[in-house]
UniProtKB/Swiss-Prot annotation:
InterPro entries referenced in this protein's UniProt entry, alphabetically: DjlA_N, TerB-like
Positions of transmembrane segments: none
Top-rank taxon: Bacteria
Keywords of the record: Plasmid, Tellurium resistance
Annotated function: Not yet known.
Organism: Alcaligenes sp
Keyword Ion transport tagged: no
Protein name in the entry: Tellurium resistance protein TerB
Biological processes annotated in GO: response to tellurium ion
Length: 122
């Protein structure tokens, strides 16, 4: 009986640690997620428009990325739609809004390059 109590405590601690790690990863990688989604939104709007196929490709990458799979798909889609809507309101506002998130990656060259590759190769 003592062993099962300690197993429960250990399980709770492990679960809490995993959740904390997930939350830290989420905070740490939010800028990368926003930059990647901004590149995807900007290229989608500039090319043939925003189709569900474009969204599926972006979501596929985010789900397969160790750094980004901590984000809820609904949150990513909501952010993508927010950026696309800014283009609908005014083209220059949309460009400025996406560049704000893309330029936030300038201090992380590897992350910036990956965000661009994802957007271009989507």
């Amino acid at each position: 009986m003592r062993m099962s109590f300690f197993d429960k405590v250990k399980g709770a601690l492990t679960s809490g640690r995993e959740e904390l790690t997930r939350q830290v990863g989420r905070y740490k990688n939010k800028k990368f997620m926003q930059g990647t989604v901004a590149v995807c939104a900007r290229i989608a709007v500039a090319s043939d428009g925003v189709s569900s196929e474009e969204k599926q490709k972006m979501i596929g990458f985010l789900r397969s990325s160790e750094e980004l799979k901590v984000f809820d798909t609904a949150e990513v889609i909501e952010f993508f739609n927010k950026l696309v809507t800014s283009f609908d309101f005014d083209l220059e506002i949309g460009k400025g809004e996406t560049m704000k998130y893309i330029l936030a990656l300038k201090d992380q060259p590897e992350a910036a390059q990956l965000a661009l590759r994802v957007g271009i190769c989507r």
